Amino acid sequence: MSDLHNESIFITGGGSGLGLALVERFIEEGAQVATLELSAAKVASLRQRFGEHILAVEGNVTCYADYQRALDQILTRSGKLDCFIGNAGIWDHNASLVNTPAETLETGFHELFNVNVLGYLLSAKACAPALIASEGSMIFTLSNAAWYPGGGGPLYTASKHAATGLIRQLAYELAPKVRVNGVGPCGMASDLRGPQALGQSETSIMQSLTPEKIAAILPLQFFPQPADFTGPYVMLASRRNNRALSGVMINADAGLAIRGIRHVAAGLDL
């Protein structure tokens, strides 16, 4: 039996991409899974696909009341919360400083930081009491942009660096009761969108990148699928497998940190 059997897991942005892969994986692990999802169509799809195995709540990650509403339903259903996974986010499609008009830069900043940083802060505030009671954990999705330049423009990169600082501070404030960690995936096949302020709300990441371009920059030389990144979340959520990690950022970058100067990888001809 999985360590996560009957554990209560709350995931944001569970309707597509990495969020959907996490929903699938934690249900496979036997957990009681809930998600807060902005899209009504995706909420309906989740309910149709997973039935009683999912509690799908329509809501906005920048709204504290929506977290409270979802938590009320989670606690009524499960009586507890063991792990919160802050996953919903938006990307800036590499919008650069020089090529972004000043007024758009300002409105784009507020929209992107509201989702990627304030959303995480509000979720932590809402979930902390239940997680303190269960001595559970929080996990937040980062990005390779939390470590390296070029994984987004200045807005996205700054937001992921801010999220890293938030994780460390929350880990400090909530210890010893709650473990707080992050997972930073590299580019993958997903429906990740951009800010409306930048005119990117209907543009997904795969409209800006191709599988070939993503695979080419990775030393492991493959095009990642969302399911490829679920393992670290399962490990961090497990009390048995993770008693000792808090304030840790797992860099799941398919080898970006070991790219060579002359070649992406030295073993391409092996």
Curated annotation (Swiss-Prot):
The entry's function note states: Converts 3-phenylpropionate-dihydrodiol (PP-dihydrodiol) and cinnamic acid-dihydrodiol (CI-dihydrodiol) into 3-(2,3-dihydroxylphenyl)propanoic acid (DHPP) and 2,3-dihydroxicinnamic acid (DHCI), respectively.
Where along this sequence does the record place binding of substrate?
143
Enzyme class label: oxidoreductase
A molecular function (GO) held by this record is: 2,3-dihydroxy-2,3-dihydro-phenylpropionate dehydrogenase activity
Q: Where is the active site?
A: 156 (proton acceptor)
InterPro entries the UniProt entry points to: BphB-like_SDR, Dihydrodiol_DH_HcaB, NAD(P)-bd_dom_sf, Sc_DH/Rdtase_CS, SDR_fam
Q: What is the gene called? A: hcaB
Its GO biological process annotations read: 3-phenylpropionate catabolic process
Q: Which UniProt keywords apply?
A: Aromatic hydrocarbons catabolism, NAD, Oxidoreductase
Which Pfam family name is an example for this entry?
adh_short
Q: Which Gene3D superfamilies match?
A: NAD(P)-binding Rossmann-like Domain (3.40.50.720)
Name the catalysed reactions: 3-(cis-5,6-dihydroxycyclohexa-1,3-dien-1-yl)propanoate + NAD(+) = 3-(2,3-dihydroxyphenyl)propanoate + NADH + H(+); (2E)-3-(cis-5,6-dihydroxycyclohexa-1,3-dien-1-yl)prop-2-enoate + NAD(+) = (2E)-3-(2,3-dihydroxyphenyl)prop-2-enoate + NADH + H(+)
Q: Which family does the record assign? A: Belongs to the short-chain dehydrogenases/reductases (SDR) family.
Does the keyword section mention NAD?
A: yes
The identity of this protein, by name, is 3-phenylpropionate-dihydrodiol/cinnamic acid-dihydrodiol dehydrogenase
Question: Native species of this protein?
Answer: Escherichia coli O7:K1 (strain IAI39 / ExPEC)
List the signal peptide residues.
Answer: none
